[in-house]
Design a protein with these regions (language model features):
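Flexible "cap/lid" loop of the alpha/beta hydrolase fold
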Residues: 115, 123-169
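Catalytic active-site module of serine/aspartate enzymes centered on a nucleophile-bearing elbow/loop
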Residues: 265-332
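Conserved loop-alpha-helix segment in the C-terminal half of the alpha/beta-hydrolase fold
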Residues: 236-275
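Active-site loop/oxyanion-hole signature of alpha/beta-hydrolase fold enzymes
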Residues: 60-105, 116, 280, 285, ...
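N-terminal cap/lid segment of alpha/beta-hydrolase-fold proteins
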Residues: 2-21
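Conserved alpha/beta-hydrolase catalytic His-Asp/Glu region
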Residues: 135-136, 160-232
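Conserved HGGG/HGGXW glycine-rich cap/lid loop of the alpha/beta-hydrolase fold
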Residues: 20-71
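Short glycine-enriched nucleophile-adjacent loop
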Residues: 107-118, 124
Length: 334
């Protein structure tokens, strides 16, 4: 599975450390920009954005190991090994340094890249930089290991897990094929405002991913302490996120909290009204415009008004009425 773009060049990069290959698509001319998709999708996520950013840059859109047309990740992979695979990708294609755009898990890969390979990273555009509540992150990782998270299609029927990401028998194959409908329903619940075309492609991407086996990036990701890493990041950074994205309390810290942990002197936030998990598909023009404007001049980029950001950060994914905060910021004469 890949984008349906006709004008891209398609190929495979050789990854020296894992001995595998990584599928990618590229187009355009100019400074390199690498797009990293979220779990459990593949590079179709950026289909609408790539041609617009390629007007000013050479864009690269790979399928992470275990996704799309790339082979499964080795079973021994940790999260930082997934990051290393992108350095191997750059090495094989002769990319000395690049800017990066990523959504959700792709943003976490970018954070690790910027921290451990600062000389290879120019500018960063994070989509939904997700910091799990720490106890939840660790319990999810342990639960997935216990039920055989890398072999989800073969697991026994288990009880549902958390509100985000079911640690359950959802992904096991069933003789009546109903598991395929469950994949669809999961994607539709998460992206009910998006086009059926996108929901269908996300469903197919999930099926394709779990048919591969190998190390699952989301399992590896849950072992990664993002909060420990963020203060070491100094590159110019933009948080590009939809106001309907799932990266919100109480399961995650806010995007503003994540941004404040960075040591970047240029540190901006852009909120796309109406955007959710499928932000880059549903709002391709708005995302491409923000990406091009920020890459062109990070310091001059304005982003979203601080008051609008503050209001957006109050919204919870799951309301917690024990933590209500009331503010009166009106201006009074007397």
């Amino acid at each position: 599975m890949a984008t349906n773009l006709k004008q891209v060049k398609r190929g495979f990069a050789n990854l020296k450390r894992s001995g595998t290959q990584m599928y990618y698509e590229t187009m355009g001319q100019g400074s390199p920009v690498v797009f990293i998709h979220q779990c459990w999708w593949n590079n179709f996520e950026y289909e609408g954005v790539l041609p617009l950013v390629a007007k000013e840059h050479t864009v690269y859109s790979p399928d992470s190991l275990g996704f799309g047309f790339s082979p499964a990740a080795p079973g021994w992979f940790e999260f930082t090994d997934f990051t290393d695979s992108f350095i191997d990708f750059m090495d094989d294609l002769g990319i000395a340094k690049a800017s990066f755009v990523g959504q959700h898990s792709g943003s976490l890969v970018m954070a690790d890249l910027a921290s451990r390979y600062p000389e290879r990273v120019d500018k960063l555009i994070f989509g939904g930089l997700a910091i799990y509540e720490d106890e939840l992150r660790k319990s999810k990782a342990a639960r997935r290991d216990m039920i055989g998270g890398n072999k989800m299609p073969y697991t026994k029927s288990l009880r549902p897990g958390d509100l985000i990401g079911l640690e359950s028998g959802l992904l096991q194959r069933k003789e009546d094929g109903s598991h395929m409908v469950e994949y669809w329903l999961e994607q539709y619940r998460e992206n009910s405002d998006s086009k059926f075309e996108y929901v269908q492609r996300a469903t197919i991407a999930n099926l394709l991913h779990y048919d591969k086996g190998g190390r699952d990036m989301i399992n590896a990701l849950l072992t990664y302490d993002l909060e420990r890493v963020l203060p070491s990041i100094t590159q110019p950074s933009l948080q590009l996120v939809g106001d309907r994205d799932c990266v919100k309390p109480p399961l995650f810290k806010t995007v503003k909290e994540a941004a404040d942990m960075l040591s970047s002197k240029i540190n901006k936030i852009k909120i796309v009204e109406g955007g959710g998990i499928m932000l880059f598909l549903d709002y391709a023009f708005e995302c491409a415009e923000a990406i091009n404007d920020f890459l062109r001049d990070p310091e001059a980029y304005e982003g979203t008004d601080s008051r609008e950001v503050a209001r957006a950060m109050k919204e919870y994914l799951v309301p917690d009425f024990d933590k209500l905060v009331f503010d009166d910021n009106n201006v009074y004469v007397v």
